[in-house]
């Protein structure tokens, strides 16, 4: 139970709290240096929403890796299409019910299904794509996004290296590595240096 709270509830609530605390600063217009050739002008960066964001989440953290990017997308003023993993159908259905209860479909839409639905979504034009999954899926997402010059954030699976330096406290490092490796039934990626 504590693992579930730590892996899902605490992290999502923490993301919401952080965003509420820092959103004003993140949305502010920032003064930036003006090129010398345009010395009489003033230059600014003005944050603006991407538009419609596709969020594709994995099976190993289906709730967390759907809601965390969704919090950020909503805070930035975007609409979102959420595609939970077909390999976590109970979580996907719960997310669909929850999000449909909280948001109108033109603001946050949830698409359930497998590879066929993924392929259909990737044929559509989105203004930003956030995808967590395998390297193979990441390549497909990147290829589809390239057709529309859509910016992409990929979090790809891989190895789980740990580097333990000579100066480390071996017992503490071992406990942390075991904890990190076996949290969420072992479907956790970690890359630590201790």
Ranges and model annotations:
Residues 16, 77, 108, 129, ...:
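Residue-level signal for inorganic ion chemistry
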Residues 32-39, 110-113, 176-177:
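Short gly/ser/thr-rich secondary-structure transition/capping motifs
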Residues 1, 18, 25-32, 171:
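Short, structured beta/alpha segment
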Residues 42-44, 110-127:
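A structured beta-alpha segment of the ubiquitous adenosine-cofactor-binding alpha/beta core
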């Amino acid at each position: 139970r504590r693992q579930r709270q730590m892996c899902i509830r605490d992290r999502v609530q923490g993301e919401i709290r952080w965003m509420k605390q820092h959103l004003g600063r993140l949305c502010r217009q920032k003064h930036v240096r003006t090129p010398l050739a345009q010395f009489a002008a003033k230059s600014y960066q003005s944050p603006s929403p991407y538009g419609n964001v596709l969020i594709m989440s994995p099976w190993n953290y289906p709730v967390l890796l759907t809601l965390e990017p969704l919090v950020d997308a909503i805070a930035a003023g975007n609409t979102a299409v959420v595609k939970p993993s077909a390999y976590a159908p109970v979580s996907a259905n719960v997310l669909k019910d929850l999000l449909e209860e909280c948001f109108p479909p033109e603001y946050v839409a949830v698409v359930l299904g497998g590879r066929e639905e993924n392929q259909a979504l990737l044929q559509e034009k989105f203004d930003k794509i956030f995808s967590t999954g395998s390297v193979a899926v990441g390549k497909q997402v990147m290829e589809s996004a390239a057709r529309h010059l859509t910016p992409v954030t990929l979090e790809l699976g891989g190895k789980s290296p740990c580097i333990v330096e000579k100066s480390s406290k071996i017992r503490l490092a071992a406990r942390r590595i075991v904890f990190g490796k076996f949290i969420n039934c072992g479907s956790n990626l970690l890359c630590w240096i201790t």
